[in-house]
């Protein structure tokens, strides 16, 4: 496995025209530039994951791709059009977003929140319909929250709430779905549940997903396409099996490691190098017996 040449990564673009891309965008907040002349393409029908160290521009790029952040230079293209010039409802019918921090209104039920995903499809001549109700019910069923429809969102666990937000995004019925750190604040079981759900949406429904993840091993296991950012620059992109190497991990995070095959999936698995060799204390002859006794008690 070998990662991309950093000098070629930003300039090398596929000849295929994909639905969502950023072209030479400069991104930042106020006067602080996060990324300069950054280009990235999201392959159609992929599960693309953006990875990199803290403050490298992952969420900033996702915000630009979702029309939440306007580039100071360059442009984001959605279906060949500059996304900033498109009507908000038109974008919302094509692209759904699950932000990093989602806050539900007080006193709202799961069913009501998921129903809000149908808002982009409403208008003066098109009000709530049986089709809308069917889509909401299907979205809740596919995310495993149908039985929670009458529960208040603020009563749910973190994992349940995240599934509800994904259900709302599904109710938009967009071919593109962007998720900013969807596993943040979740325990390991709920992280895997959410990522399994994302994989199902990609594989079974054919949606194009773009997610920001901190865990490189999760990214390598679930993504079909990785974009590796450092300092606002794409330093590698491609299939996890092609680019995730010990050299790439050291360049991204400054961390030495081994990259082995995941015994469950065969995808790359990053094993960090131990900073210090641990000394195993010598055991006396009675130690095994004491250990067994504690385990049995």
List the model feature ranges, each with a label.
Residues 115, 130-148:
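Conserved ABC ATPase "signature" region
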Residues 252-297:
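ABC ATPase nucleotide-binding domains
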Residues 20, 34-37:
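Conserved structural motif at the start of ABC-family nucleotide-binding domains
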Residues 127, 152-156, 160:
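Conserved ABC ATPase signature
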Residues 177-181:
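Catalytic Walker B motif of ABC-type/P-loop ATPase nucleotide-binding domains
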Residues 66:
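Helix-to-loop junction immediately C-terminal to a conserved catalytic motif
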Residues 74-82, 91:
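Conserved ABC transporter NBD signature motif
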């Amino acid at each position: 496995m070998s990662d991309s040449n950093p000098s070629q990564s930003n300039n090398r673009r596929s000849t295929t025209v994909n639905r969502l891309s950023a072209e030479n965008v400069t991104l930042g907040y106020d006067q602080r530039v996060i990324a300069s002349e950054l280009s990235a393409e999201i392959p159609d029908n992929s599960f693309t994951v953006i990875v990199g160290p803290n403050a490298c521009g992952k969420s900033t790029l996702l915000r630009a791709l979702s029309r939440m952040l306007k580039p100071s230079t360059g442009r984001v293209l959605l279906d060949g059009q500059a996304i900033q010039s498109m009507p908000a409802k038109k974008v919302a019918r094509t692209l759904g977003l699950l932000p990093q921090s989602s806050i539900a209104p007080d006193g709202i039920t799961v069913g009501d929140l998921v129903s809000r995903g149908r808002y982009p499809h409403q208008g003066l001549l098109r009000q709530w319909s049986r089709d809308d109700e069917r889509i909401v019910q299907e979205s809740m069923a596919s995310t495993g929250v149908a039985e929670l429809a009458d529960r208040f969102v603020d009563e749910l666990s973190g994992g349940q709430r995240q599934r509800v937000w994904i259900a709302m995004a599904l109710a938009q019925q967009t071919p593109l779905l962007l998720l900013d750190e969807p596993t943040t604040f979740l325990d390991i079981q709920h992280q895997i549940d959410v990522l399994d759900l994302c994989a199902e949406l990609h594989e079974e429904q054919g949606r194009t997903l773009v997610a920001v993840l901190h865990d490189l091993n999760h990214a390598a296991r679930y993504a079909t396409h990785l974009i590796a950012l450092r300092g606002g620059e794409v330093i590698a992109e491609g299939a996890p099996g092609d680019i995730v190497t010990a050299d790439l991990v050291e360049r991204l995070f400054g961390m030495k490691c081994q990259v082995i095959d995941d015994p469950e999936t065969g995808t790359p698995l990053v094993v960090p190098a131990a900073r210090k060799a641990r000394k195993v204390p010598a055991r006396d002859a009675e130690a095994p017996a004491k250990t067994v006794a504690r385990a049995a008690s």
